[in-house]
């Protein structure tokens, strides 16, 4: 938004010059001339456009854009990122503990983010604690996982508000734009699925602080409002106005680009989608005051001329030029034909350039055609010079015209924020690198017995264990077989039913070989 503030000083606002300020007014409709006495002469009220007979003025209040330079409508916000911190510990056979930290992300909920932000703003001491990693627990020969879910708040994160559709513009949004802020949806998605953007103030409308209340006078006829006199004293017509919302506030965009919010009973059409309004700045406001002062000065000059006419009982073309209405609308036109003072009802329109009313030498265009003169005299002090050129007294006075040109040059449209990206995105305009964390519950998970080996190592260990068990089994079976073999032999011999006995050298009978062996050994 290239906001600079709208001030619309339309002295001839409602004229069909579409934003151009007039340098002169001339009748586009001129009634029949009738003779009058000098006492019927009067000075027009140039501060009110007496169009359509709306001469009833009543005080009222209206809302307009604030005066002051607005480079952009800034909305302070913050980003909220969901982070899961995982601490994994393993304790081996001898009690050695290994800890590994990992981080993952998750998409946070708006309510949790708002609560975390409120903690931060309130200076809750739990924030300092929540910045730490989860405290790791451990168990012998086991892997223990401890996790914490944290909400990382980064602020400030500033976005630009478009007053026309209340959309937000920032680099953090997908495609640079967010249109989802409503009463039911109070956040914007960002370029990351696990990060959302939220305004610091849940009521987004409070960020659009660009309006001010003013007092003026409503011009109406019956129940119809034709226009109003603004707080600075200038009349603004509602002819050609259309309805337009700014920051969700319904108002009227006038022909000169002014935006006002006021109650009217007339049915007004909506403005086209691409219709913009002008800004209101101090410079334009100052020029508008100068224009009002100039109009007041012109009225004083008119009263002086009228007083001179009454005192001298004489009228000149130059004095009659002071009685011309300076703003569009209904008024009077005066002239002198054959030494007779004449008056006619007229409806004045604005003129942008002198060529509009003097297209060629000797031609004064009124109502689309060259107006006839009477002995070189037109009206309102306009005469035909000796060289055949049309002479208008106001062509010699350009002060009011200069004010209007200055005013016109100061009117700047209230544009969309991305119309000039350089005014929105500046180098180094990034959020400060500080983080506040909101950590809810801590989750702990304990695994089964873990020897700390990789998956292939576990298979090797199991295979080796099986092999060792098999070898031990074979060894035990072998040993047991050797121990039981002699008993098996003895049992076999007894099974034959034969008994072997021998006689020793001493003549003693030995019943068996074992007895003999033991007896022999004993004697030995």
UniProtKB/Swiss-Prot annotation:
Cysteine pairs forming cystine bridges in this chain are: 43-302, 54-226, 80-113, 178-188, 208-247, 242-271, 363-370
Q: Which UniProt keywords apply?
A: Disulfide bond, Glycoprotein, Lipoprotein, Membrane, Palmitate, Signal, Transmembrane, Transmembrane helix, Viral envelope protein, Virion
Keyword flag tRNA processing:
no
Using the record, list the residue span of the signal peptide; answer none if the entry has no such feature: 1-19
Topology within the bilayer: Single-pass type I membrane protein
Question: What InterPro entries does this protein's entry cite?
Answer: PH_Rhabdo_glycop, Rhabdo_glycop_CD, Rhabdo_glycop_FD
Sites of glycosylation?
56, 338
Q: S-palmitoyl cysteine: lipidated where?
A: 480
Stretches assigned to the Virion surface side:
20-459
Q: Where in the cell is it found?
A: Virion membrane
One GO cellular-component annotation of the UniProt record comes to: viral membrane
Task: Output the PTM entry.
Answer: Glycosylated and palmitoylated by host. Glycosylation is crucial for glycoprotein export at the cell surface.
Q: Which residue ranges does the entry give as Intravirion-facing topology? A: 481-524
Practical use = Primary surface antigen capable of inducing and reacting with virus-neutralizing antibodies. Almost all human and veterinary vaccines are based on the functional aspects of the G protein.
Q: Name one GO biological process term.
A: fusion of virus membrane with host endosome membrane
Indicate the impact reported for residue 481 to R.
Answer: In strain: Isolate Germany
Transmembrane stretches in the record are 460-480
Homology family: Belongs to the lyssavirus glycoprotein family.
Assembly mode: Homotrimer. Interacts with matrix protein. Interacts with host TRFC. Interacts with host BST2; this interaction inhibits viral budding by tethering new virions to the cell surface. Interacts with ITGB1. Interacts with host GRM2.
Q: What else is known?
A: Arg-352 is highly involved in rabies virus pathogenicity. Its mutation dramatically attenuates the virus.
Q: What this chain does, per the record?
A: Attaches the virus to host cellular receptor, inducing endocytosis of the virion by using different host proteins including TFRC, GRM2 and ITGB1. In the endosome, the acidic pH induces conformational changes in the glycoprotein trimer, which trigger fusion between virus and cell membrane. There is convincing in vitro evidence that the muscular form of the nicotinic acetylcholine receptor (nAChR), the neuronal cell adhesion molecule (NCAM), and the p75 neurotrophin receptor (p75NTR) bind glycoprotein and thereby facilitate rabies virus entry into cells.
What's this protein's name?
Answer: Glycoprotein
